[in-house]
Amino acid sequence: VSSDPNTAPPSASQNVYDDASFFEGYRTLRQGDTGLNGALEFPALKRLLPDLAGLHVLDLGCGFGDFARYARAHGAVSVTAVDVSSRMLDEARARTEDGAITYLQRSIETYHAATRAFDLVVSSLALHYVEDYAGVVARIYDSLRSNGRFVFSVEHPICTAYPAGWVRDEDGHKQHWPVDRYRQEGRRDTRWFVDGVVKYHRTVETYVNTLLKAGFTLTHLGEPAPIPDALAVRPDLEADCRRPPVLFLAATRAAS
């Protein structure tokens, strides 16, 4: 039996993206990318990236491989793209013709990269599905080379704290977003396309201090709004200007 943790079968971590109903709903959502990913998350991510030329990159929760292909198109030498979902990876491989992108089916919590293997680690809207955030952060730190960067986004804690959605008036207009149980960190059972989608709520404080404790230097904290062009196409996204849907953090491993 191999002792390499990355040759083991995928773990029993949540894999809702392989649910047929969920996957079809998500794929439909991403068509044209006029939703949250295209209107807000990916534009904000690109603003935080270093020059990708010559870098070895790790993409945790790679989904359809959009970032992996972007990184290669902008000069990355190699991209290791990890996702727990076989459906997502099948779609990613179908969209990719590039031998320098390696797709691996693995949960984020069980993937172990080699020490100092990467210059950049990116994770887009995936770590709020992870229970052991501290363990993942520690392994990411170990996987980075000197001056390596970790850039990631998560669903904003004011959204995960009390996932009840907008409070609306009798005509259905959005009035306000309730925030409750903010300091009660832990599991939240939610509905997104299907019932039983598990997320893990953490405070902003925990997201930041866990990075610092692991040895990272925080370089950016952001709560971006949709870009103007997206609002012109999707005026309903104006609600995401009223409360931040996404939290971005960027951190660096010190030179050593």
Model segments located where?
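A short SAM/SAH-binding and catalytic strip from SAM-dependent methyltransferases
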Residues: 120-133
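Core SAM-dependent methyltransferase catalytic element
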Residues: 214-216, 234-256
